[in-house]
Amino acid sequence: MMNGKKVLVAMSGGVDSSAAAVLLRQQGYSCDGAMLRLYNGEVEGTCCSADDAADARSVAYGLGMKFYVFNETERFARDVMDRFVAEYCAGRTPNPCIDCNRCLKFGALLERALLLGYDYLATGHYARVKLDEASGKYRLLRGRDRSKDQSYVLYQLGQHQLAHLLLPVGEYDKPSIRRSARQAGLINADKSDSQDICFVPDGDYTRFLQEYGGVKMIPGDFVDRAGHVLGRHKGLPCYTTGQRKGLGVSAGKHVYVLRKNVQDNTILLGDNEELFTSVLTADQVNWISGETPASPLRVTAKTRYSQTEAAATVHPLPDGRIRVEFDVPQRAITAGQAVVLYDGEQVLGGGTIE
């Protein structure tokens, strides 16, 4: 039975977003599909490619849905790829998936959905949205399948976006989603999951920075805390905090990247133990509730997508930033990555590590 609500489903050509359309139609929603065109001829990508678009269109038509393709190449280049280049050049390690979600999926695409008269945007993310009746606030929760949970990359969502967002896949585990897709006869039911950064499909960030961003790799010194030169590096963007392999340094022991210094183009190396720290600060903070806590909060937090959260206290600072103090030191906290805060299953928000 139809419930009268119209949904625009963001389809990537993968099984999760396609299954989202199947699940929503079963729940009585009137669904159409849409994909964002993110690349021009200069960049090859593994997400939203021509093959992906063909798969998504085939699924949409097979389900009796309309299918739109919206050109967002300029916005993707400006807000995601150009920022990726700028962050690496500033000595940080960004997470472009978070920028894409904020600016494209839940920015440009949600705007288009609402302008076209849809009530909701839906995606295939493994996370959940719930309305808290007592407060009237929408809450972002982890996906039920903890091994696939994608709530980390959604921490920048706000109340307006959550009010118009459906995440049906988040209620299921991956095997159930594939089973639903097979039962619906979807051509991509067994399609493999995408990996890595979509616009760097081969994982060669250095080559991307050089060819797309025009970045020149300037060699410099590897140094220790005493200022001794341990060797030469190939350019700051070639390395990330915590890296051990590929340094080309003979120090008589394992050494790791501790910090990249943009000012003098050096990279500080040291022992693994020196990578652990208990405190970080973050800016560009988002609180999903829209309200900054008035006092410190006990939370769990993680600083990488694949990491398990750790107990911490978050201190809101007067300038809008946060200071996060972990109970147990964390390894390789990296500038440019996101720290995301949880209260049990609920995502409270997060920020960009300084």
Segments from the language model and where they lie:
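AMP-forming adenylation/ATP pyrophosphatase catalytic core
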Residues: 40-41, 122-354
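ATP-dependent adenylation/nucleotidyltransferase module used to activate substrates
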Residues: 1-155, 166, 175, 182
